[in-house]
Amino acid sequence: MKIGGIDPATLPTVFTLVIPRGDTGRLVFQATGLKDMEKFKKLCPEPVPPMMTTKDGTVADIKDENYISDLTGYLKRRTAYYVVFSLEPSNIEWDTVDLESPGTWINWEVDLKKAGLSDVECGRVLSLVTEANCLDEAKLQRARLLFLAGTQVPLQK
């Protein structure tokens, strides 16, 4: 498929973060947006609240403590899934994260900190993942301006 004569698969999709280390050292993180969440949905089904009977009939008990706990864990794994799978182009050799084990994904930040990254640097890595997976107004505006100017300049910062 082409859009305006361009095959979307040929456009760059990798975003890069370079964290300096001393005068000459650097850590390079690369992230790409995830195309879908099918693998996540298969490995981590969304929790369902228990039902309760009220005077109005049967309704979901969204205040159930077990449901809230399950939902919190689910949302943490979902965020961690975005992080570890978006960072695949970085070729990170995780210490405790196993890509096939959803319960370990939440260790991404622990592993990065154990490797020497600060809280701020971990925040920048998370921002990189967010940037790779979001189509924000700034990106759309830049693309519009480049299109209207008739240029084809890479959209990355």
Model regions and ranges:
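A structural detector for beta-sheet-dominated domains
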Residues: 4, 18-20, 30-32
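Short, surface-exposed, charged amphipathic helix/loop patches that serve as local interaction elements
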Residues: 25-157
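Short acidic-hydrophobic surface loop/beta-edge motif
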Residues: 12-24
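Extended acidic low-complexity intrinsically disordered regions
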Residues: 1-13
